[in-house]
Amino acid sequence: MKKAYLYIVIWAMAAACTPHNKPSNPTTTQQVDSIYTESEFRRYGDYYNSGHQVYAIDLLSEGLDYDSTGHIVGTGCNLYLSDIFAPKDSIMRLPAGTYTMDSVAKDMHFLRGMYFEGSVTGAYLLMIQESQIQRIMLLTRGTMTIDYVEKDVILDFNLYLADSTQYHCTYIGPATYR
């Protein structure tokens, strides 16, 4: 019985957030069916004294949650984007529009995933199983589109891993700013 349960957990995790290779037919779109159910938006102000408001977005898939200390627990996929740059006057929330992944701080851009001083930063995916990070995948190019409908935010991500594997996902729900 334990073996069957383990297979189900592994299958569910893979189904929740496994990227797919880019399709060979350029007229079709391959999508990933990551289902993100929780979001946390963080405001850092003009963190780098660069004239930009800096934000981060943390999305959790089904099966993940935060414990009382703020650590991620459970099994699933965590999409994290740090260093999202918005115009200086965007002090309440990220403005609607399309943001492009880049390696420099510019309005309506966010930093690509990278290792910096022994830590991962920028845009990346964490595959988590039983509250332990199993895999880190850096995102190296792509876009994020933000829209707002009443109290909900709509996030549409068209991102790529370092090996050019496409990762597409969406989030629709409340935008909790901290």
Located regions from the model:
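Positively charged n-region of N-terminal signal peptides that target proteins for export
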Residues: 1-4
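Post-signal peptide N-terminal segment of mature Sec-exported envelope proteins
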Residues: 25-43
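C-terminal motif of bacterial Sec signal peptides marking the signal peptidase cleavage site
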Residues: 13-16
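Surface-exposed helix/loop patches within compact recognition domains
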Residues: 48-145
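Short, hydrophobic/aromatic-rich segments at coil-to-beta transitions
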Residues: 54-55, 150-156
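Edge beta-strand at a domain terminus
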Residues: 23-26, 83, 140-144, 156-178
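Sec-dependent N-terminal signal peptides
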Residues: 7-8
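Bacterial signal peptide processing site
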Residues: 18-21
